[in-house]
């Protein structure tokens, strides 16, 4: 079974939900950059205040900041890990590849959770996070299409990419992912 996983997909695709389920079922480390950043905001640290301002505008947090957080967490002892929401652009992919090479834990599979935009907007509005309003959501989807979608082709070319139809019920999606992990 593969144990070094990455979840790609637009905001609201269910990356966090599926990653949390799999990490609990397999005792894997779940690295959600969104959750790590929100934790900084909740603690109201200097860094958290900067992150909050950036996220409220629907913009992405700097590559260097996110890489530091990810590197620190990947270095912990673990049975496996799931990256959720990182990397988001090709520059981050290159930085992540260096980190993974240094810790000798290569990425084994990338799941792309595919969901239509209208479903994403509805899901995001329903989850009720402070940073989820329609204008911010549309900005985030636009940024995603510009910066993150090229990663799909990158990982496809490395034969690491697995498409997941994530416009369905949680159990069906989870079963599809588990079958492809074997």
Curated annotation (Swiss-Prot):
Query: What are the binding positions for AMP in this chain?
Result: 33, 38, 59-61, 85-88, 92, 129, 140
Transferase found in the keyword field: yes
Signal sequence region: none
Per the UniProt record, the source organism is Prochlorococcus marinus (strain MIT 9515)
Gene Ontology process terms (BP) = AMP salvage
Q: What role does it play?
A: Catalyzes the reversible transfer of the terminal phosphate group between ATP and AMP. Plays an important role in cellular energy homeostasis and in adenine nucleotide metabolism.
Task: Identify the stretch(es) annotated as NMP.
Answer: 32-61
Q: From the record, what ranges are coiled-coil?
A: none
Q: What is its main location?
A: cytoplasm
The protein depicted here goes by the name Adenylate kinase
Family per UniProt? Belongs to the adenylate kinase family.
Question: By which gene is this protein encoded?
Answer: adk
The reactions it catalyses are: AMP + ATP = 2 ADP
User: PANTHER family annotated for this entry?
Assistant: NUCLEOTIDE KINASE
Instruction: State how it assembles.
Output: Monomer.
Q: Note down the stretches annotated as region LID.
A: 126-132
Report keywords, A-Z: ATP-binding, Cytoplasm, Kinase, Nucleotide biosynthesis, Nucleotide-binding, Transferase
Query: In the Enzyme Commission scheme, what number(s) does this protein have?
Result: 2.7.4.3
Q: Mitochondrion as a keyword?
A: no
What is the main EC category here?
transferase
Superkingdom to which the source organism belongs: Bacteria
């Amino acid at each position: 079974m593969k144990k070094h996983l990455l979840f790609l997909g637009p905001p609201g695709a269910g990356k966090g939900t599926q990653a949390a389920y799999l990490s609990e079922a397999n005792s894997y480390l779940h690295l959600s950059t969104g959750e790590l950043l929100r934790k900084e905001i909740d603690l109201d640290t200097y860094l958290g205040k900067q992150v909050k301002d950036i996220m409220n505008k629907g913009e992405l947090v700097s590559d260097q900041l996110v890489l530091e957080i990810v590197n620190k967490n990947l270095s912990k002892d673990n049975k496996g890990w799931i990256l959720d929401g990182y990397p988001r652009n090709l520059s981050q992919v290159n930085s992540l590849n260096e980190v993974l090479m240094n810790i000798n834990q290569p990425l084994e599979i990338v799941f792309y959770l595919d969901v239509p935009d209208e479903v994403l907007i509805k899901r995001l509005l329903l989850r009720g996070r402070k940073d989820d309003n329609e204008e911010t959501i549309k900005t985030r989807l636009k940024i995603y299409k510009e910066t993150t979608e090229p990663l799909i082709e990158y990982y496809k070319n490395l034969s690491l990419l697995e498409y997941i139809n994530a416009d369905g019920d949680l159990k069906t999606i989870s079963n599809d992912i588990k079958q492809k992990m074997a």
